[in-house]
Amino acid sequence: MARGPKKHLKRLAAPNHWMLDKLSGKWAPRPSSGPHKLRECLPLILVLRNRLKYALTKKEVTLILMQRLVKVDGKVRTDPNYPAGFMDVISIEKTKENFRLLFDPKGRFTLQRITPEEAKFKLARVTRVETGNQGIPYVHTDDGRTIRYPDPAISIHDTIKIDIESGKITAFIPFEVNNLCMIVGGHNLGRVGAVTHREKHPGSFDIVHVTDTAGHQFATRLSNVFIIGKASQTFVSLPAGKGVRRSRVDERNAALKRRGEKIETVA
């Protein structure tokens, strides 16, 4: 009979967006408890060892973190298995680098390099709006924050801009048609586009229709939509491709063009 929480994670059971190869061992790092779920996070050890190549082993990652040089959302983190998630800002003082954790158009975590000015804030989606004891209003966000006395105009599914140093709300983006969004779950994970229509289904899942800059249309659940900008102006810098998912044929033609080979078309 199992007693207590699980402490291990096999490599084959790890999320695909971690991009771990199957032949480098049997085990994968199991994320610690934190603001993001196991299958929606990227442990710090994978950030420093697998993505940035600043270390070769977990022991080296621990030595780096114990120098208290790595911050996530402005707080020093020394746990190699700390779960960093979507929109988190990772700062490394020694190298003066700042990264924001985003999804690429293929649905994989990517480290987007950002400027020091952009590293001062993060975006979070409002998941609940409540009124507590003595009539104090507060909101819950998808990264585990509870913020009191928000703007009365903020409602569920809106996105708030949080100042990392103070933890206060500096602006918010309402969930409206024509606003820019990124898909954070489902088959369209990582795609970016403008909200064109919202289908309401009482008692079931609301469906949101989105159109990207290439004119491709797709639909997803309301819970998978994260607003990142007003109209065509985004609040955060996006990875290469601007969230447009290309087809297999387009990717093949782009690869042939880079190599200088002839592109053959099938009639």
Swiss-Prot record:
It is found in: Cytoplasm. GO terms for biological process: actin cytoskeleton organization; translation. Its main location: cytoplasm. CDD domains: KOW_RPS4, S4. It comes from the Eukaryota. GO terms for molecular function: inositol hexakisphosphate binding; RNA binding; rRNA binding; structural constituent of ribosome. GO terms for cellular component: cytoskeleton; cytosolic small ribosomal subunit; extracellular matrix; protein-containing complex. InterPro entries: Rib_uL2_dom2 (IPR014722), Ribosomal_eS4 (IPR000876), Ribosomal_eS4_C (IPR032277), Ribosomal_eS4_central_region (IPR013845), Ribosomal_eS4_central_sf (IPR038237), Ribosomal_eS4_KOW (IPR041982), Ribosomal_eS4_N (IPR013843), Ribosomal_eS4_N_CS (IPR018199). Belongs to the eukaryotic ribosomal protein eS4 family. This is Small ribosomal subunit protein eS4. It comes from Dictyostelium discoideum. The gene is rps4.
